Amino acid sequence: MAAINAFYAQSGGATAVINATACGLIQEARRHHLADPTRIGQVYAGRDGILGALREDLIDTSLESDADIARLRQTPGGAFGSSRFHLGPLATHRAMYERLAAVLAAHDIGYFFINGGEGSMGAAWHLSQMMREIGQPLRVI
C-alpha cells in the first residue's frame, strides 16, 4: 500500500507562529512515517500558500534536514511564502477547485492542511465539499 502524501499551505499574514505550526506538522508527519511508512508519505508545502497548489509549485519538505525543519520554530515570516488569495465559493469558482483536485490527485495527496484565518477556513470547507462531491478522498484540516 502506497503512503498518502500531505499538502500544507500558509495563508494570510506570515508570522513566526505559522512557521512553528509548519515545523510541528512536518515533524509529526515524519514521526508517523517512521512508525508506519504506509501511513503518511511526503509533506508538500505550497509556495505562496494555496497559489502553490494552483500553480503546481510544491516544495518537497522531505528534501530538508530534520535540523532545518526544527529551525522553522525560530524563523520569522512565512518560510514557504503566503498569500491572501481568496478561492471564493465553490458555486462561482468551480474551475479553481477542480484544478486543486487535479494537482492533489497527481501527487497522491490525501491530507490538506491550511494555516490561516477565516478566509482559509472557508476555502478549506469549500474544498472538502468539492472533494466529497467528486468522490476523491481528502482529509482537510
Predicted regions and their residues:
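N-terminal phosphate-binding or glycine-rich loops at protein starts, especially the Walker A/P-loop
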Residues: 1-57
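A short, small-residue-rich loop immediately preceding and capping a beta-strand
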Residues: 5-11, 110-119
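Short, ordered loop/turn segments at secondary-structure junctions
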Residues: 11-13, 46-51, 84-85, 117-119, ...
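Alpha-helical scaffold segments in soluble metabolic enzymes
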Residues: 20, 24-28, 42, 71, ...
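General beta-strand structural signal in soluble alpha/beta enzymes
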Residues: 42-47, 80-82, 114-116, 123, ...
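Glycine-rich oxoanion-binding loops at beta->alpha junctions
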Residues: 55-112, 119-121
